[in-house]
Amino acid sequence: MNFATKVSLLLLAIAVIVIVEGGEGDSWFEEHEESDTERDFPLSKEYESCVRPRKCKPPLKCNKAQICVDPNKGW
C-alpha cells in the first residue's frame, strides 16, 4: 500500500466514526433537552406575570411586559 492509500483509508475510517458518533450525540441531546416550562422558573410569587387589570402585591406594579416589578428598582 502506498502512502496515499493509507491516508485515504484513515480519512474514511475517521469519517465513519464521526458520522456514527454524531448520530448518537443528537439522540442524547433530544432525550436530555429541557422543555420551555423547565427553563422558565419564576423569580418568586411576587414577580409573577400579571395580566391587566390583575393587580400585583404592593409595592410592585404591572409593567408593559405584564410582569410585576418594583417601580423603585426598575425591575
From Swiss-Prot:
Expressed by the venom gland. Residues 26-39 form a propeptide. Keywords: Calcium channel impairing toxin, Disulfide bond, Ion channel impairing toxin, Ryanodine-sensitive calcium-release channel impairing toxin, Secreted, Signal, Toxin. Transmembrane segments: none annotated. Residues 1-25 form the signal peptide. It is found in: Secreted. One of its GO terms (cellular component) is extracellular region. Its main location: secreted. Structure of this peptide is made of two-stranded beta-sheets (or DDH for disulfide-directed beta-hairpin) that is uncommon for a scorpion-venom peptide, since it does not contain the CSalpha/beta, CSalpha/alpha, or knottin motif common to other disulfide-rich scorpion toxins. This structure may be the evolutionary precursor to the knottin motif. Affects the activity of both ryanodine-sensitive calcium-release channels RyR1 and RyR2 with high potency. At lower concentrations the toxin increases full openings of the RyRs, and at higher concentrations it inhibits full openings and induce openings to subconductance levels and reduces the number of full conductance openings. The different actions may be attributed to the toxins binding at different sites on the RyRs, with binding at a high-affinity site mediating the increase in full openings and the induction of subconductance states evoked upon binding to a lower-affinity site. This is Phi-liotoxin-Lw1a.
